[in-house]
Amino acid sequence: MDNFLKQISSNVKKPIAELEDPDAVIKFHYMNISFNFPDLYYCNNNLFDKPENNLLDISKSLLMLNSFSHECFILQDILRVIRRYGHVYDVYFLPIGWLVGHGEAPKYHASIKLIRSNTQEIIDGIIRRQLSQYGIQGDNLSIFVDSSNEVAINRHSIIGARQLNPICVVSFYPFDPEHKVFFVIYVGRYKDKYCGISYVADREDMYKVINRIYPYVSCFYLVSDGIINFHTTPVANHTRNIKPLPVNYCNTLCEIVYDFEYLKFEQGVMSIPVFMPFVPKQFVSIINLPDDILITCTASSNIEYITHIDNKKLKRILIIIKDKFLKGTIMQGTFKKVNIIRHKKYTYTITYSSFDCPKLEDTKSSLPSTCNKAILDGRRYVTKTFNDTI
C-alpha cells in the first residue's frame, strides 16, 4: 500500500507542517492468508515480468483479474470480510503478481497480506469458514501471523494544531476499484514520514464526500483514469477560512484506511469537475461480440476499445484483442460483424465498417460439422469455449 500512496501522490504538493511528537504508538502484526483455488490450472513460468508497479501496471493487473471472474469474485468476497477486522496491505494473484507493491511470490495461487492488532485473533476462524464455502481448506490454505515482526504506527494529536494546510488526494481504491473511492488527507509530516488520515467511500457517494471534505482542505488532487494513462487535476479551495479538521488524531500514512465518517464532516459546496477515478475494463475478442449489431469503438496509443454496443454505453469498456486479420487496421468508428465457418475454421468477417478494414469476399458459412475442433470425440454436438471450438 505504501507504493500505491506514492504513485497517486507523485504530482501532489504535500503540506510541510511539522507535527509534534506522537502521543501514542499503535502496534500491529502482519498476517498472510495464502491459498490455492482447487480448480485453477494456470502457469506463466518464464513469462511473467513486472519490474515496477506504477498506476498503469496496477490498472493492467485489474484488467487481467477480470479475465478470471470466478477467482476474482472469491478474492473480492474475502477482501470485504477482511476490511471489517484488519487493514489490507497487498493482494497477490499468480497471473498478476502483487497488485500494488513488490515482494517475494508465495507458493500459492493467491495471498492477502494485512495488518491486524493482537485483539483481532477472531479473523482466523472467520476467514477459514468463508473460504471453506469455495472448497478452499486443508493443504490449500495457509494462515500465518508474523508475531516477530511488529508494525509500529505513530498517532499524532492535532487538537488545537495551528498552521496546518491539509490537502486531499482522491483516487480509485485498488482493492475494490469499481465500487470504492479512496480519499487520502495529508495533514503534515513527522521527520521523514507524511501523516494524515485515509478514508474509503462508495463510488456513488464520491461527490458527496468531496463536498464534505472541501471546507477542511486547501486543495483537492483528483486522480483520473484516462484509459491509456492517469492524470492528476488540482482543484484549489479559494476560500480564506479553512476549517480545522474535525478529527483529533492522524497517523503515519500507510495501509490504515477507515470508512468515511459523514457525521464528523459538515456539508460544503464546491464546483467539482466530472472525473473518473477508475474505468472498468475487460478483454474481448471480435468473435465473441454479437452478430449484426452496430458496435462503436475508438483507438488511442495502439489500444483499441469498444464503448457502445447497439448504441448503448457499456459499463465496462472492452479492450479488443486483435488477430492477424485486423493487424493493420485502426479500429475507430462503428462496425458490424458476423461469425462464419470458413475453410474448416470458426472465424468472423466484418460486414460493415466506417473505417478501412479487410473483408472476406465469400461470407457463406459451412456446416458446423465441418469445423475443426480442439476435441474430436465423435459427437455431433458442436460449440465453443471463449477460445476454442469443441
From Swiss-Prot:
GO biological process: viral process
Annotated localization: Virion
GO CC, any one term: virion component
UniProt key word DNA-binding: yes
An example Gene Ontology molecular-function term: DNA binding
Its job: Binds to the hairpin form of the viral telomeric sequence. Might direct genome encapsidation into the virus particle.
Protein's name according to its UniProt entry: Telomere-binding protein I6 homolog
